[in-house]
Amino acid sequence: MPKAVKVSREEELLRNAILLFSRGGFRETSLQEIADELGITRPLFYYYFESKEDLLWRIIGHLGDTLLEQARPIAVADEPPTRRLTRLFERHAETLLENVDAFRIYFAERNQLSGKRDLRLKRGERLYHELITEVIVEGQRLGEIRPGDPHLATRLAMGTANSLLRWFTPAVAISAQELMSATVEYMLAGLTAKS
């Protein structure tokens, strides 16, 4: 019999907040609604989170770091650039599809962060895009990737992958794995040089 995984109260609150924000939006959801939905009082809310923005940060702040940490070893692997791009895009799509609600909140509400949190998020996004762009540049140099603006290619590829969040649900007639494979195939087909 599998052991029950013990979830901390804080993790439970974060999971519930993800569902709440994905349904109603961050700005539109009041602190009282959050407390009511989480089954806590407003004073208890402040025991776990400094502010509503802190709650948002706890939900989305780590997502960019996760993508970057997963991408670094793939980007420098001893493989052809097209193979590394395939693996990078697969990992990106897989991570999005494993965390659909949290990433929907990330893309819809990231502009609600201020100060150091906003700067950290933007820095992580920039580093992630630079990492992918470097692989595209290497692929262009070797003739594997078509010539053109590598920054634009990165933005278009990431935009394609991120657009999955706008319409994918588990009820779609295609599995997450099939969707990820098809998306990566189309993304790479758009980047690779014609033989």
Pin down the residues of each PLM region.
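Helix-turn-helix
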Residues: 12, 20-54, 58
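Short, solvent-exposed amphipathic helices
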Residues: 62, 73, 91, 101-105, ...
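Amphipathic alpha-helical segments used for helix-helix packing
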Residues: 84, 97-116, 166, 170
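Hydrophobic alpha-helical connector segments
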Residues: 58, 72-101, 153-157
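N-terminal intrinsically disordered/low-complexity leader segments
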Residues: 1-8, 195
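Amphipathic alpha-helical packing segments from all-alpha helical-bundle domains
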Residues: 65-69, 115-141, 151-155, 178
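C-terminal peripheral helix-coil segments that are non-catalytic and often amphipathic
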Residues: 91-94, 98, 129-141, 160, ...
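Short hydrophobic clusters on alpha-helical segments that form packing/core surfaces
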Residues: 9, 13-21, 92, 187
